[in-house]
A protein has these predicted regions:
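Short, flexible, solvent-exposed loop/turn segments with mixed acidic/basic and small polar residues
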Residues: 80-91, 257-258, 283-288
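Short Gly/Thr-rich strand-loop-strand
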Residues: 113, 119-148
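A short, exposed loop/beta-hairpin motif centered on an aromatic-Gly-Thr core
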Residues: 265-274, 294-297
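Short, mixed-charge low-complexity intrinsically disordered segments
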Residues: 290-337
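A short, charged, amphipathic alpha-helix used as a generic interaction element across diverse proteins
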Residues: 273-289
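Surface-exposed, low-hydrophobicity interaction/linker segments
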Residues: 24-81, 266
Length: 451
């Protein structure tokens, strides 16, 4: 790595003026200055991450912690949007994110960081608790601006959120890519439907009313939301899984360079050390004719699923919120059936099975790829990781199906199952899947491939 360059406040003021004056014609030297600003956060970010990761694991062994340095194009965008801002004073150039499995664990980590501040390598300068006071669109998270105690004194933004809160936030960004809804930038101005859709999904499960679920089901159907996202996720998941199986992705290669094209197709490279990773990031940024979205991030002892969760807005391979949408459609189906609203029942029930016919077809495709992947045979860890992922997802969907069947009024439901099958259940059977429900009362339900 080249020797560190030093810049004055005046240098940064002049940099901001040059960028605002000609944002489409930024000089190579100015890009280099922005890159130097990024890597100047190296030691502060590493120290903050180490302490945060250690604290998070004590509270939640399944927590996911990452760090990243703000992308060059994001710094430029911020300088243009905020005319008086100086590059070196942007508070979130360096950032850590910790995703906990529950909101209770988020609050436990938050309290721990405040209580143990005297033993940590940073002090908390300011905080915003969007869990106690969510944003209007439903966003929930805790943001801490911390400053390192040891020179060079740097500010790092820490985000603490639960898995559900993270899934929601990343799904908003995925919707913006897939539907050009601009929710993150313009709220409900460009697409009121999808804004309301995500606002409702931001609620906790216990807060969702039947009316909310009906609206979620209605908007999902209008945009074929689960079908379109499901297709994209499957393609990207299989592509990324194959790439990941070729990588080292060990303790010796914790830096991941992610690039995503306009269609949401990701590419992945890994690096053993910070300097090599940053050189690759900067070279990729400068030589990017396809205008790919590029981010460099750091993980520690991670798995494919954790990578997919932490950066699902880049990878577009997986998001648990989709199961919540499917649950809403199932609940509306049950309500309509039990209350003799036949038209509403048929619409939602057919949508439910149409979505699942595609979903199980995609899972079958994934199993086929697993069987064909030569790289997977070299690693028992990757084998176990992949099979566990498939099994877990199938189990989640089967639970949704079982819970839906249990919710139907038994006598009416048995009569219905004897006398009538929807066209889409027949379509599912024609693709080779059998639907068993002999013991509905015990929710003994199975979807399997015909022999």
């Amino acid at each position: 790595m080249e020797q560190e360059r030093n810049y004055t406040n005046g240098d940064y003021k002049r940099l901001g003026r040059r960028i605002r004056k000609e944002p489409d014609n930024i000089a190579q030297e100015d890009y280099q200055m922005l890159q130097d600003l990024r890597i100047a956060n190296k030691s502060a970010l590493a120290a903050t991450f180490k302490a945060l990761h250690h604290a998070a694991l004590k509270i939640d062994k399944d927590s996911v912690c990452t760090y990243r340095i703000k992308r060059i194009e994001s710094i430029i965008s911020k300088l243009i949007r905020f005319q008086d801002m100086e590059a070196q004073r942007i508070a979130d150039i360096a950032g850590c994110r910790c995703i906990m499995t529950s909101e209770e664990n988020v609050m436990a980590l938050y309290e721990h960081l405040k209580k143990k501040e005297n033993k940590l390598p940073f002090i908390i300068r300011s905080e915003k608790n969007y869990i106690e006071s969510p944003k209007e669109n439903g966003y929930r998270s805790i943001h801490l601006n911390v400053q390192t105690k040891e020179p060079p004194l740097k500010v790092v933004e820490i985000q603490l959120r639960s898995l559900d809160q993270h899934n929601w936030a990343t799904l908003v960004e995925i919707s913006d890519v897939l539907f050009q809804s601009k929710l993150k930038e313009f709220g409900d101005k460009e697409n009121p439907d999808l804004y309301e859709f995500h606002r409702l999904l931001a609620k906790r499960d216990s807060e969702l009313t039947l009316s909310d679920k009906k609206k979620i089901s209605e908007i999902s159907g209008k945009y074929q939301y689960l079908e379109r996202i499901g297709t994209l996720f499957t393609e990207n998941h299989l592509n990324l899984r194959a790439q990941r199986n070729k990588l080292k992705t060990s303790r010796n290669a914790p830096f991941l360079l992610i690039s995503t094209d306009k269609e949401g197709k990701p590419e992945l490279k890994d690096f053993s050390n910070f300097d090599d990773a940053e050189i690759a990031y900067f070279e990729t940024f400068l030589n990017n004719p396809e205008n790919k979205n590029i981010v460099l991030t750091h993980f520690k002892n991670t798995t494919f699923d954790k990578i997919s969760i932490a950066y699902s807005n880049y990878f577009m391979t997986y998001n648990e919120t989709l199961f919540r949408i499917l649950n809403s459609i199932a609940d509306v189906s049950v309500y309509a059936f039990n209350n003799y609203k036949i038209g509403e029942f048929k619409k939602n029930y057919k949508a439910f099975w149409f979505i699942l016919s595609k979903w199980f077809g995609n899972k079958q495709k994934e199993v086929g790829l697993y069987n064909e992947d030569k790289n997977i045979r070299k690693s028992n860890k990757k084998k176990k990781e992949w099979t566990s992922s498939i099994t877990s997802n199938v189990a989640k969907v089967n639970r949704i199906i079982a819970n839906m069947c249990q919710g139907f009024s038994s006598n009416i439901w048995h009569y219905f199952m004897k006398r009538k099958r929807t066209r889409l259940e027949k379509e599912l059977a024609s693709k080779g899947y059998l639907f068993f429900n002999e013991k509905i009362s015990n929710t003994q339900l199975l979807l399997c491939k015909k022999k």
